[in-house]
């Protein structure tokens, strides 16, 4: 278990080439849809867009995480040989990549929101993050890793 956790939680340079595009694609999609929603003056759509962007990032990271593990065989060999150990390692690795991508996506969206607010005050897309309470951000950053650790521990223990 210790070897699997250290293998999964280590932020390696190859992970960044996978996590950065996975994070920036939903950000660009969210920004374009937010600009389209802002032109139609639909405030309810602007509140839903951050959640849709986060869900899109998680799904994309799950798919790319499996592809990454299939192409990175040495990391896959560090997982337990049992079926439960492999599943736990896969869940932990995907959740780690998802957290990294969510942090990159949140930073990029806030930066794009600030740029949009400065240049296009009528289409203040950065204000769409205003609808999410402050306590949700730490939960979004920490909860996937904690769930992955607990899930990996339960699967390898029983």
Predicted regions and their residues:
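Hydrophobic alpha-helical transmembrane segments of membrane proteins
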Residues: 1-74, 83-158
């Amino acid at each position: 278990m210790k070897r699997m956790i250290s293998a999964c939680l280590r932020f390696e340079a190859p992970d960044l080439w996978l996590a950065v595009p996975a994070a920036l694609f939903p950000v660009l999609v969210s920004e374009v849809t937010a600009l389209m929603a802002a032109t139609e003056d639909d405030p309810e759509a602007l509140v839903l867009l951050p959640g849709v962007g986060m869900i899109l990032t998680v799904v994309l990271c799950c798919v790319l995480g499996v592809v990454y593990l299939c192409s990175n065989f040495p990391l896959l060999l560090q997982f337990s040989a049992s079926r439960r150990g492999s599943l736990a390692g896969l869940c932990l690795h995907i959740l780690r990549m998802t957290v990294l991508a969510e942090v990159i996506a949140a930073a990029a969206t806030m930066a794009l929101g600030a740029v949009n607010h400065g240049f296009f005050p009528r289409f203040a897309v950065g204000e769409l993050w205003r609808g999410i309470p402050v306590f949700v951000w730490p939960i979004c950053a920490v909860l996937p890793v904690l769930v992955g650790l607990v899930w990996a521990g339960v699967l390898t223990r029983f």
